[in-house]
Amino acid sequence: MFAEGRIPLWLVATIAGLGVIAVLGLFFYGAYAGLGSSM
C-alpha cells in the first residue's frame, strides 16, 4: 500500500474484482468441462 495516495481505490477494487471473477470462471469452467467429459 505504498502508492495508496496515487492509485485510486476504485481501480484497485476493479482489478481485484476482475481477478476473482477470472479465477472463479476458470474454476467453474474446468469443473463443467470435467463433468461433461466424464459423463
From Swiss-Prot:
An annotated GO BP: photosynthesis
Entry's InterPro entries? PSII_PsbJ, PSII_PsbJ_sf
Asked whether the keyword ATP-binding is assigned, the reply is no
Q: Which GO terms describe its cellular component?
A: photosystem II reaction center; plasma membrane-derived thylakoid membrane
Membrane topology note? Single-pass membrane protein
Pfam families listed in its UniProt record: PsbJ
Q: Which domain of life is it from?
A: Bacteria
List the PANTHER family hit by this protein, alphabetically: PHOTOSYSTEM II REACTION CENTER PROTEIN J
Give the record's family classification: Belongs to the PsbJ family.
State the protein's purpose. Answer: One of the components of the core complex of photosystem II (PSII). PSII is a light-driven water:plastoquinone oxidoreductase that uses light energy to abstract electrons from H(2)O, generating O(2) and a proton gradient subsequently used for ATP formation. It consists of a core antenna complex that captures photons, and an electron transfer chain that converts photonic excitation into a charge separation.
Q: What is this protein called?
A: Photosystem II reaction center protein J
Q: Which organism is it from?
A: Microcystis aeruginosa (strain NIES-843 / IAM M-2473)
Primary gene name:
psbJ
